[in-house]
Amino acid sequence: MANIFEVPQPGNDLLEKADQVRLASIKISQTENHNRIKALNSMADCLEKSTKEILEANNEDYTRAQKKGISKALLSRLKLSKEKLNSGIEGVRKVGDLADPVNQVQIKRELAKGLILERKTVPIGVLGVIFESRPDAVMQISSLAIRSGNGVMLKGGSEANLTNTAIVKALKKGLYESGLDKNAICLLTSRKDSMSMLNLEKYINLIIPRGSNELVKFIQENTRIPVLGHADGICHLFIDNEANLEMALSVALDSKIQYPAACNAIETLLVHKDIAQVFLEKAIPLFNSNDVKLIGDKRTVELGVKYEASVEDWQTEYLDLILSIKIVDDLEEAINHIQKFSSKHTDGIITENSTSAKKFMNVVDSAGVFHNCSTRFADGFRYGFGAEIGISTQTLPPRGPVGLEGLVTYKYFLNGDGNIVDDFSSGKAIYTHKDL
């Protein structure tokens, strides 16, 4: 790992950029809600005006990436169509429609006469986001950062440098034209800078990596800055013996092929032995006709799956049109397999038995547990968050798709009238602890 990534100390240029973002984030944290909404609309306007420039930059990035032989999965994420760009721009505007996450009172309590405690949400500060390929992520991340009163330092994959630069140029112009500090958004373009970010604990409050398993794990192990993210997206779908067959086929297909490069696409399909033959005799030709390479255990091979799986296949995130299939004896075996190999991202069950569904959803320890629906719904936009900055598979919150609510923390505000603890110790004053 250390041979692939190194963590150099930040140079003066990076330190200056980080300080500019830090100072801008302080200003934005004090900005009124309506001004942050105004900024988002201005950012969207500038993106629209820069459509031609952005798409031309993306075409150049895509052509260069093809010549370098970049994988199909990364090429798919890199490509920015006009429709995808327009959708991203609309997403920036929709983030402005979401409720203000800042200055929300979570607790208001009278501790004693004249002593009032409040717990209120506040921006985190500066976000450091490292991601691969997807230039549309720049729009999502930046809009969520500004909406929640944070600054952001962005580092995308080098294959998208031209596209990301064009997008950030428009976003910064939008900030400036709205009256906010354009330095709240900063794009880094070198790998050295992205690794040096890990040593910016005096400037960055949260690192959000969105990339390969190897990159995410390295970041988690090599920074003192808190990290929000997931290293793998090994998602499962279990077809129970009491599943509706047509539903199972439809959901399984959507969960795999709707966008196979997504982290919420399934990598393993588990099938109850009592329904395996009737299900697979329809599923195998269905997946084959959609160019999905099927890999299975011995029992599935006997039923027509072409390639036999190894243990490695059960713990591989393909991000491609490849699917591992395993036949299990019962619900318990399905759950045990998931608990052993799942990355705790999203796992689902197809069944008409509500008791089985309830047990599956209560026992499987993943950020998302789904019943009778596609795993592809595990997404901040589809959850109604407006957009997501990432997905967290950690047990402590935030967990799952992270939108605005995951980009604020809280402070305790205590207002008194000369109150001192000694009065309570001596009995001169008493605590009332009354919620207001």
Curated annotation (Swiss-Prot):
Q: What is its EC number?
A: 1.2.1.41
Q: Which reaction does it catalyse?
A: L-glutamate 5-semialdehyde + phosphate + NADP(+) = L-glutamyl 5-phosphate + NADPH + H(+)
In its keyword annotation, does this UniProt entry include Membrane?
no
Q: Which domain of life is it from?
A: Bacteria
Record's Gene Ontology CC terms? cytoplasm
Name the keywords, alphabetized: Amino-acid biosynthesis, Cytoplasm, NADP, Oxidoreductase, Proline biosynthesis
According to the UniProt entry, its GO molecular function terms are: glutamate-5-semialdehyde dehydrogenase activity; NADP binding
Q: Where in the cell is it found?
A: Cytoplasm
Its protein name is: Gamma-glutamyl phosphate reductase
- Recorded source organism is Prochlorococcus marinus (strain MIT 9312)
The organism that produces this protein has a lineage beginning with: Bacteria, Bacillati, Cyanobacteriota, Cyanophyceae, Synechococcales
